């Protein structure tokens, strides 16, 4: 007889589950049973041979089990630790300039348009739909300096069921495109309004994040006040650091009294255990030590680092310093909205560093898979809630079908010997796309295919 106090189960799946742990970068669990409670949490993950025991404990019948096809598998939802939702309007174009010129010619004019709420709604709706469809269950979004349209992004994200951090961009310095900046007072006041109004909505999985654009667009006064807001409200923080050489030099010239780029953020209370900094290509060992001491994270954005000719992040060096790290698409400096692309580019960048004898080894695909899932969750301070299929975590997952209609993957006899092989998983990570992502779950709720309400 089953225990009466057990909560009802929303899902029971039987099949293959692929995830990471801190001791194993890719664990393939074949013929397992996974149960999801009505609250969206994983309550068991055990070998299918334990079905009778689990059925007694959790009060389910064999007919309630959904059996995956032998070629299908579940993997954790992908975590995009750095994406500019507002730049989605020109993603896939305009990447012919280095960072600072790119910001002036393309990015600031594009973001300036988001004072138009109708335009913002169209772009934000499309980017949330597109990223969810491509398996991004958690996204860390930059919006723009416009509070109302940034609040709209949070609302849209919640409506679609995506887990997210949403940041209203703060910048009170911008001589290259002066139409797109705030006064210091406006930026502080509007950030406080943004945070307050977002928190009043009580979204279950969408949170505000304090977002100074980067040191070149923020005065010391603004950075200090944003650091205080984050500290007082116990909020996450996101920004950019050491993306390209010209930027690093410009920061040195703008803030000559600081020891280095990292200290600019650190001395203004912006480098905490809730901070995620994008790029970090030129961080010194000394700076990485500070990241480790503060518990701050790095978002590795290989596509944009290559597309804007910014540099290479040495992930192995970051890991050697025990700094938390995840992957980011960095739309639109990165032209792809797909985290699968981020996985592939991260492997390639690591291979380039090996070829150039910077490192003695390269990251494996399995290690990068972990960065895109468990690593990303840790970088955003969510590894106690999501990132893999450990019991007690929320079920953020994507169902992969390598044999989907019009699949970009060709499978052969050797790919299957009764159960799914690791070759099939690798083929999906290297060759797959949204056609292979049949279903997406966030917090136990199926969000793709989309419901008629969105």
Swiss-Prot record:
Modified residues (Phosphoserine): 453
Keyword Transferase part of the UniProt annotation: no
InterPro entries reported for this sequence: Amidohydro-rel, Guanine_deaminase, Metal-dep_hydrolase_composite, Metal_Hydrolase, Metallo-dep_hydrolases
Coiled coil regions, renumbered to chain: none
Residue positions binding substrate: 84-87, 213-214, 240-243, 330
Binding site for Zn(2+): 82, 84, 240, 330
Note on cofactor: Binds 1 zinc ion per subunit.
Keyword Repeat: no
Single annotated GO MF: zinc ion binding
Pfam families named among the record's database cross-references: Amidohydro_1
Cofactor(s) recorded in Swiss-Prot or TrEMBL: Zn(2+)
Pathway: Purine metabolism; guanine degradation; xanthine from guanine: step 1/1
Keywords: Hydrolase, Metal-binding, Phosphoprotein, Zinc
Main EC class the enzyme belongs to: hydrolase
Protein's job: Catalyzes the hydrolytic deamination of guanine, producing xanthine and ammonia.
Assembly and oligomerization: Homodimer.
Protein name per Swiss-Prot or TrEMBL: Guanine deaminase
Organism of origin: Homo sapiens (Human)
Lineage start: Eukaryota, Metazoa, Chordata, Craniata, Vertebrata
